[in-house]
Amino acid sequence: MDKKKFKEEIEKLREEIEYHNYRYYVLADPVISDEEYDKLLKKLIELEKKYPEFYSPTSPTQKVGGKVLDGFKKVMHSIPMLSLDNTYNEEEIKEFDERIKKLLGVNEVEYVCELKIDGISVALRYENGQFVTALSRGDGIEGEDISENVKKIKSIPLRLFKNLTIEVRGEIFMPVKEFEKYNKIAEEEGLQPFANPRNATAGTIRQLDSSIVAKRNLDSFIYYVVNPEIYGLKTQWEALKFLKEIGFKTNPYSRLCHDVNCVIDFWKEMTKKRTQLDYWIDGLVIKVNNFEYQRKLGETAKAPRWAIAFKFPSIKAESKILNIELNVGRTGVITPVAVLEPINLEGSIVKRASLHNFDYIKEKDIRIGDHVYVEKAGGIIPQIVSVIKEKRTGKELEIEIPKSCPICGGKVGKISEEEVAIRCLNPHCPQKLKRHMEIFVSKSAFNISGLGEKIVEKIVDARLINDVADIFYLTPFDLAQISGLGQKSIANILEQIEKAKNTPLYRVIIGLGIPLVGEKTAKILADKFKSIKALSQASYDELTSIEGIGPEVAKNIIEYFKNEKTKEIIRKLENAGVKLEQEEDTKKSSKLAGLTFVITGKFNSFTREEVKEIIEKLGGKVTNTVSSKTDYLLVGEKPGSKYQKALELGVKIINEDEFKKMIID
């Protein structure tokens, strides 16, 4: 194949991946599995490395990996990014409507209501359909060039579906689930957690290392076209449809309202629904729909006259701190938790709120007995936002940093000067072991069924194990000491433990509990190093040269394997007969090669994860959605909607016994 054909193949792959990015991140309607997508991306990465002359700054591969920047240069906006006037009540919205109609000299005005996403505003510029720059709002006159970081946001296209030269604007945000995930890791690792998703977004988008941005899974909604008349657009509603057509993600909740009463009804509706969303919103943005009307109304120096923010009432309530509990996590981080007088906050009873760390307590001057305002960060996570100091009586107690671990009584301290967390420094702390064991035996790791949270706690409390590797040395006599376990349960647990010795390498890596190493990273490491021994000997440079492994992850891997306790755990796993190497691809059968499966329901002989691994090991593919390209729907007990879809499309349906016959014959 000559270079011209390779160039054509690269272009074709880019277009295909961009299409799947759009289906997944914009439409939320993927048509291929994650595995298929990863294969396409991997192939493109390999071809671009082999033929660097075909490099493109807008290739989908620019969304993985990262660059380290010196800083962010300031750039003037093409037109100012203005702020909005705002209101919190219905009467002022009605006054806004009357003012608009009076200025325009009309009796009726249509409005577009958009969710006011609490994130970071961004201006995106494209030339001939190619991404050029991304600017933050800054002071509204000039912003910072955040292009390298914005390239890592999967919902923002690097190439449009049309070859347009255009500037659009929107909001970058961190979904609540990503915010929760980051803060959980931050607290475990002794890092300062973010107060809310908006701060998390701002802190992420200004990272000098764009590989960190890629890992934090920011998202976007685009809502504004600069100079819309160039593209024949006459209304904001048309502009939103146009933005989606050319490849941008727009918010599905936007609503066209024919009068102000519709606006108020929608505001009331979203006031109730806002806590059900996976992103933080603090109100609606009400815009005059007609662009000609917008031009007539104009702007003040601060804000457009044709738009207003209709804010939601604050989700907060008053409570009192009754006590402080100290929780110990997997890495020993001690997290203070406020025990509160129960309060009803947005329909749920709140009795506790995390205080994150002792620096946070000092900064907010929080004391036992204080009356405080409690708010739901992102509409979900209870947190104390302020102390009502005027209600202090003088009987409040200052919260002291513990001098010893609340669980084991061991020494506490910081493992580095930079971190804010206080940790239990005892390597044998039972609470640390309990939290690690929960990960170790989980489905995503060694998948040892029968060892639920309560049984794990009893095993640790009975001192039957000193570390996670000891699970492979348990005997029937050991387990007989655990209340609630009969002979049948003991036999089942021991059978599952024996079976777990052949766990795939990537799941072994997950089970080790290396900070910041999840399933995707574990698979990358397993494919690259093939064994725990090779991974444990990897250098920082070797790790950071791997696509998808950033500096933070590399540092954690090296620190983890340098630890003497880790070395002991690895030795014990090896001596117990746990497989610490990856099977070579040559062992793969091609029995199911070229066949695509979808799985639904529950199985007697396998877990769904095991079924997936069997199919892939035999050369088949597993996807999440039934389509005309699906060869088989494998059905267990209580199948879901996929069963009906397969019937409609005429996809062959097989049960567990038929599947067993297929893989054995």
Swiss-Prot record:
UniProt-annotated binding residues for NAD(+): D34, E35, E36, Y37, D38, S83, L84, E114, R137, E171, K287, K311
Residues the entry annotates as binding Zn(2+): C405, C408, C424, C429
Alphabetic keyword roster: DNA damage, DNA repair, DNA replication, Ligase, Magnesium, Manganese, Metal-binding, NAD, Zinc
The protein's Enzyme Commission number: 6.5.1.2
Pfam families for this protein: BRCT, DNA_ligase_aden, DNA_ligase_OB, DNA_ligase_ZBD, HHH_2, HHH_5, Nlig-Ia
Listed PROSITE patterns: BRCT (PS50172), DNA_LIGASE_N1 (PS01055), DNA_LIGASE_N2 (PS01056)
Function: DNA ligase that catalyzes the formation of phosphodiester linkages between 5'-phosphoryl and 3'-hydroxyl groups in double-stranded DNA using NAD as a coenzyme and as the energy source for the reaction. It is essential for DNA replication and repair of damaged DNA.
Homology family: Belongs to the NAD-dependent DNA ligase family. LigA subfamily.
Protein name per Swiss-Prot or TrEMBL: DNA ligase
Source taxonomy: Bacteria, Thermotogati, Thermotogota, Thermotogae, Thermotogales
